[in-house]
Amino acid sequence: MTDKQIKNYFNMTALGFLAYAVLLQILAVIVVVLFSIAFPDLSSDSMYYSMMVAVVPCMLFLHFLFQNSNLPSLRVNPVNIEETGSDSMDLEEKSFSPLVFLHYFLIFCGVQWISSLLTMPLVFLFQKIGMDLSYSEMAAKGGALDNIPMLIYTVLFAPVVEELVFRGIFYKRFKAFGAFFTAFASSLFFALIHSNFLQFIPAFMMGFVLFSIRDRYGLRYSILLHLTNNALAIVVNNLGGSRLWVLSAYGLILLA
């Protein structure tokens, strides 16, 4: 493959991601408007309904855009998959256990703690120069536990779709360039799609953990880890302030 072909391949990938992000926002706005007209009583939850509706066609758009143009491999002497039984970046049948999941979950929590430490100085800096980060903080924390549409989207819908897109479609798009590049590029896109300053560093770092579990054990387990994290984050954000034991338990998890 020539340098020009590789450049065109990456240009196509970047344009596909940009089109996905723009299309997602446009469809979400259209659905919000339609929901507010058809169901005015659901206006407060229209954002979550709109995202549920919008992400599916956007994901299908990416799937059909890239399905016949992904590179199988750039290795000079690729291993015969029939002889080894699996590709080095497609080992979906490795033995998975609750202990393996706990191992990744603790790493995931630790990465969140580290990323929050990295984000705090930037938050302080931007607040000092007068930037209002209240919306970013609210979006990062999620909603209330009694907000059913929020729970469905954040705990179930978003993890499944995001993993299918970033550890599915883009994973396959980049895997010919090696494990590290695939982890970096898919994590970068994953962070960018959140469109939230406070979530960029955490999402980027957590993308590497999600890549690792996906690469070793399969997509279903990165989905499981993602939705478990989202569920725990919402519980801690809602109950951590009023129930000390919740915050203490989460702190022990981070220390582990």
Model regions and ranges:
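Primarily residues marking transmembrane-helix entry/exit sites
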Residues: 6, 10-14, 144, 148, ...
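Mid-bilayer segments of alpha-helical transmembrane spans in multi-pass integral membrane proteins
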Residues: 109, 113-117, 121, 151, ...
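N-terminal, membrane-interfacial amphipathic/helix-forming hydrophobic leader that caps
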Residues: 1-105, 109, 113, 216-217, ...
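Alpha-helical transmembrane segments of polytopic integral membrane proteins
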Residues: 24, 59-63, 67, 115, ...
